[in-house]
Amino acid sequence: MIVNSLSLCYHNKLILAPMVRVGTLPMRLLALDYGADIVYCEELIDLKMLQCKRVVNEVLSTVDFVAPDDRVVFRTCEREQSRVVFQMGTSDAERALAVARLVENDVAGIDVNMGCPKEYSTKGGMGAALLSDPDKIEKILSTLVKGTHRPVTCKIRILPSLEDTLNLVKRIERTGISAIAVHGRNRDERPQHPVSCEVIRAIAETLSIPVIANGGSHDHIQQHVDIEDFRQATAASSVMVARAAMWNPSIFLKDGLRPLEEVMQKYIRYAVQYDNHYTNTKYCLCQMLREQLESPQGRLLHAAQSSQEICEAFGLGAFYEETIRELDARRADLLAKTPEAVEEPAEDTSGIIKMAIRFDRRAYPPQITPKMCLLEWCRREKLPQPVYETVQRTIDRMFCSVVTVAEQKYQSTLWDKSKKLAEQTAAIVCLRSQGLPEGRLGEESPSLNKRKREAPDQDPGGPRVQEPALPGEICKKPFVTLDSSEENLLEGC
C-alpha cells in the first residue's frame, strides 16, 4: 500500500487520539465509520518496531508488522491507509527514522509521542522526558522531516510556564513538522485537573502550522456538538478526542451518539474480521461498558475467554462462526493456488505420531497447560526435556510444531495461529498417545498443583513469581484499581 507523499491535511479535522491498548485496528476503523477524519494508532516503541518484519496477510487483506515471537505489533489495512497516523515512542533520531522508513508506505503520517508521563516511557528518555531536552526534540523531528516522505507531527504536553511552552513550540515548528498536537495539561497533571484551554489558544495564536487540541474529554466533550465548542475555546485548527471516543466512538457522528450496544457489536464485528486478539477486544469493550460491567452482559463479557465467547455474549455467535468459515475458506483457496507454499516439518515424517487436534485454552485452568504437564512427566520419568521444532507456512502464517520425547516425535495435522499454540497442540498429541493427563479441567495433575503451592516457600528471599491473571481480571482490573495515572495513560499520553 502506497499513498501520496505529504497528502495528509491537519486543518479542521476530527481525530482519534493515540491510546494505549485502545487504538488498534478495530477501534480505528470504527472511528472512521462514525466520522473521524484521522486516526492515530497506539504509541509503539521504536525498539520493538525495529525487531518486526513486514508481512502481507492475504487472508485478512492486511499488512502486519510481526515481532520475532510471532505477535502482531501493528496491523493496518487499505481502508485506513490514507488516514492512519503511526505514533512512535522514541528517544533517538536514527531509530525514529528507521521506524518511519519501515512503515511509511503503509501509513499516512508519522507522529512522535512527547507527552506520555508514564514511567515506562520517561525512564527510556521518551514521552514527556523529551520536553526537558529541546535539543533532542529538534534532532528527532528534523531527522524525520528530512528523511521520510510522510508528514511528521508530534504530540506534547504543556510546560508549567507559558513562556517556556511558547519557546518550545516555536522551536518545534522550525523543524518543519506539519502539525502539533497539544494536550492541555502538564506532565504532572491528570484528567481530574482542568485542561488549560487558554494555553492551547496561546500556542495556536503563536504558530502558523495547525494546532490540534487534546485533553477535553469529559469536562468539555460529552457529545458531538461539544467538539466544536472545545475547538473554538482553544482556537485550534483541529480536535483530537481520546477518552470520550474510547467510551463511545460514535462521538464523531454528527447525528449524535448511537446506542452503546450497537456500537459494541459493530466493534466486535471488526475485531473478528481482522483477527484481533480476544484480550485486546475484551479490554476495549470493558472501557465502553464502564459502570455497566456488573450488568448481565457485563458479567458475560467478564467471563469470556475467547473471541467466540465474546461474540456469544453479544448475540453474535452465528456471525463469528460464519466469519471463521469464510476466513478458513479464503485460507484454503490461497493454499490451493500456491501449493509450493505449504510447508511440512523438515523431519522425516515416517516415524511421527500424528493426531488431528488443536489446543483450546478454555478447556484448561489458567495456571496449567499441556506443555507443563508433559515437562513434569518427563522429569518424573527422568527423561530429557521435550524438544519443540516449529515451522511457519508462508501463505497464511500458520504454525505446526513437532515435539520430540524419548526419541519419538509427535505432531498435530492441524496448523495453529501462533508458535505457542502449535507447541501446546504437539504436547497434547504426545500426552494423549501415552494415555497421560494433559491438565484439562477436572484432571489437573496433583504434582503440578503441589509445585504451584510450594513455590513461594522454596526461597523466601528470592523473587516472587507472578501468578497468571484469573479469568476476567483483564476486564475487571481497570475499573477496580484504576488510579489517576492509569486514566492518564488512556488519554493518549
Curated annotation (Swiss-Prot):
The active site is at residue 116. Residues 367-371, 420-424 are annotated as: Interaction with tRNA. InterPro entries: Aldolase_TIM (IPR013785), dsRBD_dom (IPR014720), DUS-like_FMN-bd (IPR035587), DUS2_DSRM (IPR044463), tRNA-DUS-like (IPR052582), tRNA_hU_synthase_CS (IPR018517). It is found in: Cytoplasm; Endoplasmic reticulum. Its EC number is 1.3.1.91. SMART domains: DSRM. Its main location: cytoplasm. Residues 438-472 are annotated as: Disordered. Keywords: Cytoplasm, Endoplasmic reticulum, Flavoprotein, FMN, Oxidoreductase, Phosphoprotein, RNA-binding, tRNA processing. Pfam families: dsrm, Dus. GO terms for molecular function: double-stranded RNA binding; flavin adenine dinucleotide binding; FMN binding; NADPH binding; protein kinase inhibitor activity; tRNA binding; tRNA dihydrouridine synthase activity; tRNA-dihydrouridine20 synthase activity. One of its GO terms (cellular component) is cytosol. PANTHER family: TRNA-DIHYDROURIDINE(20) SYNTHASE [NAD(P)+]-LIKE. Belongs to the Dus family. Dus2 subfamily. This is tRNA-dihydrouridine(20) synthase [NAD(P)+]-like. It comes from Mus musculus (Mouse). The lineage of its organism: Eukaryota, Metazoa, Chordata, Craniata, Vertebrata. The gene is Dus2.
